[in-house]
A protein has these predicted regions:
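ATP-dependent small-molecule kinase phosphotransfer cores
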Residues: 295-346
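Conserved NTP-donor binding/palm subdomain of two-metal-ion nucleotidyltransferases/polymerases, i.e.
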Residues: 1-39, 43-258
């Protein structure tokens, strides 16, 4: 079977007895099982230890990230599928937090175990489409940031990305309208009308930036126990720190790392092999290349050219001076590269 390895992983998870579900982007499960996008699993918080033990037993490795990518109640795990030759990335959530990028300060207070079902096409437990649609509406509303560069440049009607449109269309065709109304009445009573307003705007293709800001305000003010907003001063400071440290973002795995050396004569394929491996691993991990051969760039070329010119003109001391600078430049470049290198191990 095409996805036999990842299918077996989920069979083990299903048989473990640990409550979990895939709670978002279930329209894209075919892409996830092919190893081309991530899985987002919501796991019972009381079963964390058992679930993590099973992941390690199955060959997963926990991926760590710098502060800018750390979110409350979420961990990352990687699994190499040698059948597909892909790295599967699992986002493991122990509570449902969402919100603006880098912030994620809104907690959805709901017992997901009441709403889990088996997917019809893949061996995975998913959240029922009515809850997924409600969550997608709330995520879309509160992810909107008027000050984001994309929205400032648009200055017009708000537009959703294609992947989100695909999710909305899939869910709107999959939901049971009566079930949807029952869930909204019982679990989202205080904000159900705002959720319905957004769905109506989506169906009429009339989602405006003003409408999104209005919905953010109304839901925040009208919310009962469905959502919990973290707006403390300390949390705002954490958001500011994340924003400032994003440029230093790094991903690594728990077991440390490994240095892979490629040695060979010119033309043996070292560069192409390194590029292929670097591209593959960089999809999920921070990897740096350290070149120990002759540095060839514009500065080195210019210094060598000046050395050659003065040598031709019989100014040997000046020529040697520039040759010395070539050596210093190459050495400094290698030191700089060595400090940047992140060691990885798979």
């Amino acid at each position: 079977m095409q996805y036999s390895q990842i299918n077996n992983i989920f069979s083990e998870l299903n048989n473990s007895g640990v409550p979990y579900c895939h709670f978002k982007s279930n329209a894209n499960l075919d892409i996830s099982f092919a190893g081309n996008t991530d899985f987002d699993l919501l796991v019972d918080k009381h079963s964390i230890t058992a679930f993590k033990s099973l992941l390690y037993k199955l060959g997963f490795k926990q991926r760590y990230t710098t502060f800018d990518k750390n979110y409350v109640c979420m961990e990352d795990y990687l699994y190499y599928d040698d059948k597909l030759e892909k790295i599967h990335h699992f986002h493991i959530h122990y509570d449902l937090f969402f919100g603006k990028k880098l912030k994620k300060n809104i907690f959805l207070n709901i017992n997901f175990q009441k709403f889990i079902i088996k997917d019809e096409n893949f061996p995975i437990i998913i959240i029922q489409p009515e809850i997924e649609l409600i969550l997608l509406v709330l995520r879309t509303i509160f992810k909107f940031d008027l000050l984001a560069i994309r929205n400032i440049l648009l200055l017009r009607k708000f537009s959703l990305v294609k992947s989100v449109i695909r999710e909305f269309d899939h869910l709107l065709s999959a939901i049971d309208r009566n079930k949807m109304d029952d869930i909204l009445n019982e679990y989202f009573n205080n904000i159900q009308f705002f959720i319905k307003d957004f769905i109506n705007m989506y169906n009429s293709k009339n989602i405006t930036m003003i409408a999104l800001l209005k919905l953010q305000y109304l839901i925040t003010k009208s919310n009962g126990e469905e959502l919990f907003f973290i707006n403390s001063q300390k949390y705002k400071k954490l958001y500011s720190i994340k924003k400032n440290t994003k440029k230093f973002s790094t991903n690594w795995i728990e077991s440390g790392g490994r240095t892979i050396a490629f040695v060979g004569v010119d033309g043996s394929g070292k560069s192409s092999t390194i590029e292929a491996i670097h591209k593959f691993l960089s999809y999920k991990l921070t990897v740096e290349k350290l070149y120990l051969g002759k540095v060839s760039d514009y500065k080195a070329f210019s210094l060598n050219l000046l050395s050659a010119i003065f040598s031709k003109l019989k100014f040997q001391k000046i020529s040697q001076f520039f040759r010395g600078w070539v050596s210093i430049y190459i050495a400094s470049k290698k030191v700089k590269f060595s400090k940047k290198v992140k060691i990885i191990k798979i």
